[in-house]
């Protein structure tokens, strides 16, 4: 569904929070322009917003809205036609010997926050003073516009949490919010 089709009817206009700009996390030296909506107003059409390229952060939904760039792409994996490659099967078979997974409600813990901080410091070179505290972790990953439909996909090995995915369960899709 195209953004123009979703925006008709006034609901999205009521949810409109504005545009923001930041350094593009995907293309060095570029600026990203984002369109923000209040997720509380659009929860019941969130699946359609995903189809239009929106993502979620806490209680807000957003999408890249750059005027001169269209490089950000939504990745969809149609599960009914997806077939693992030989390499994917090999990695899967090795992984199930080492890791266990659990799906649980999204909740805060110091262990999860520390795992996210480790990821951000390593993967994004985020300085210590910018790393999330409990409040920012909760706002971004736990307190959402989707309530109990936001879940955690936990990855464990030897009794230690080593990976965490925050996912939104929708009627026809799972949407990954963040994985670290």
Predicted regions located by residue number:
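Terminal substrate-recognition subdomain of acyl/acetyltransferases
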Residues: 1-107
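A conserved beta-strand-loop-helix scaffold within acyl/acetyltransferase catalytic domains
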Residues: 57-68, 74-180
């Amino acid at each position: 569904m195209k953004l123009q089709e979703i925006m008709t009817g006034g609901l999205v206009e009521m949810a409109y929070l504005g545009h923001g700009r930041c350094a593009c996390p995907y293309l060095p030296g570029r600026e990203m322009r984002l369109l923000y909506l209040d997720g509380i107003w659009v929860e019941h059409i969130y699946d359609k917003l995903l189809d239009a390229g929106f993502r979620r952060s806490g209680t807000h939904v957003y999408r890249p809205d750059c005027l001169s760039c269209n490089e950000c792409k939504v990745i969809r994996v149609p599960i009914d036609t997806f077939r693992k490659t030989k390499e994917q099967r090999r990695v899967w078979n090795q992984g199930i010997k080492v890791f266990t997974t659990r799906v649980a409600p999204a909740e805060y813990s110091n262990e999860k926050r520390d795992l996210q901080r480790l990821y951000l410091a390593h993967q994004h070179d985020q300085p210590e003073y910018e790393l999330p505290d409990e409040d920012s972790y909760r706002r971004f990953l736990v307190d959402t516009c989707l309530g109990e439909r936001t879940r955690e996909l936990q990855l464990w090995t030897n009794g230690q949490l080593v990976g965490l995915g925050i996912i939104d369960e929708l009627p026809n899709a799972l949407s990954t919010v963040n994985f670290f």
